[in-house]
Amino acid sequence: MARYLSRADLSHIAGKYIDQYYTRFGISKDDPEPIDPERLASSVLGLNVKMLPLCSDGSILGLTVFQRCGFTVTLGDGTKLVEMFMPKDVVIDSALASDSCTGCRNFTIAHEAAHHILADLFPNDYGKAVKCRGHIAYRERNGQPSWEEWQANTLAAELLMPTFLVNAEIERAALCLPNGILYKSASDPNYERILEMAARIGVSWSAIRIRLQQMQVINGKPIHCHPLDVIRFGE
């Protein structure tokens, strides 16, 4: 079973790796820059990030490899691809290569990197999990929730969207939500600003929304009908 780690614990762990990343690339927290998860994975963690077709239906977003093993995927036309993976391989489904999938691709890389971080830090806990599960950990689009996957998702979010970086982006975008209400409408300039923040950080709309809710910048779910929309289009 995975070790118990709170969100605060995972934030602390992420901070150490972000510090290493910033030091390696000469970035200052006084002028923070978004974290490129592929550079973090390769340069800081020593992982090998690859893009290959992993499935024909989009169900597998990525996987991380702990021990040498073979992997077979059957494509939509029936073609079988057989790959040999090595420890420290992180493989992302090639369907995520397009620019429109940047947020999902980045989060998947960070998620798989998080599995390696946790396995390295807590081998007695995660080593047992690996032996029970096999040699590979998958990130599935609609996978069953588990404690280990929650930790990997949370650590991934902390790596990509640390509080200091999000706060800097809030200031840069002049985001102002004094009552915490966000309208998911082009009539609300804050909605466009948050979309711009997501693009700059390299995450999806849903990822930045959840992060802003956790930071209590947004309260509750975004409201779809802006008052100006009612005036323009009626109820």
Task: Give the ranges of each region predicted by the language model.
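Active-site hotspot residues in diverse enzymes, especially metal/ion-binding acidic/histidine motifs
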Residues: 1-235
